[in-house]
Amino acid sequence: MRRTFIKKEGVVITTLARYLLGEKCGNRLKTIDELANECRSSVGLTQAALKTLESSGAIRIERRGRNGSYLVEMDNKALLTHVDINNVVCAMPLPYTRLYEGLASGLKAQFDGIPFYYAHMRGADIRVECLLNGVYDMAVVSRLAAESYLTQKGLCLALELGPHTYVGEHQLICRKGESANVKRVGLDNRSADQKIMTDVFFGGSDVERVDLSYHESLQRIVKGDVDAVIWNVVAENELTMLGLEATPLTDDPRFLQATEAVVLTRVDDYPMQQLLRAVVDKHALLAHQQRVVSGEQEPSY
């Protein structure tokens, strides 16, 4: 009987820890009856679980009689030890640039001691869809894409890394001397960034959108299938060899947003949000990324 009680209390502690991670110090907590109902447990067992969290130093509660109970102190790291996080899976772009490799390597290094895995997939739309469906725990996208997704419910912007952490710079690529004669622009419909930036750049212009794969973009311009694409320029010499030229994208803040990496979680996944806050040192992550980009360090992810 005692063993069964301990097992049940452990389940209740996990549920309470997940709830408390979504609260802030100073908040009035739900009543013990409400918590017992959410934990699908008895009031006595819920009280015992709450006392266990208090005695462990994870939280401190101030009880004010009829005015309720208030959370006055909380230790996120201590609470996280009571949450059942066996591993973390992050949806990430395909690592075809040193910047992506550095980001993947740097983020993984922050989760030292926690099993951390990547699911590499092309297209922010599919990464976010898998996140919302509970397939993965977090997703890396650009701030530009994130802003479009955050208009729908269910997502939380959990980590922001600043400009030029996702890509260096997007530019308009076309054949030399033909930037003023763009009639057909290539567009990979799986790329939220490219769709938004193409709409921003061309606005109401009478330009035909031609569906293509992002990684075929340059060759399709060379062949004459399209006149231009908005593309992340990694190697300028490659453009020169192909007879292409690049025009910087300016005059709209959304072009800069497309260069910033952010991490999304589900809005109700408080443990994952707190885990990111607890373990990620942004400066160390970005320094790691830059060492990979410069070749000082080999990526590991």
Curated annotation (Swiss-Prot):
Transmembrane segments: none annotated. InterPro entries: HTH_41, YhfZ_C. It comes from the Bacteria. This is Uncharacterized protein YhfZ. The lineage of its organism: Bacteria, Pseudomonadati, Pseudomonadota, Gammaproteobacteria, Enterobacterales. The gene is yhfZ.
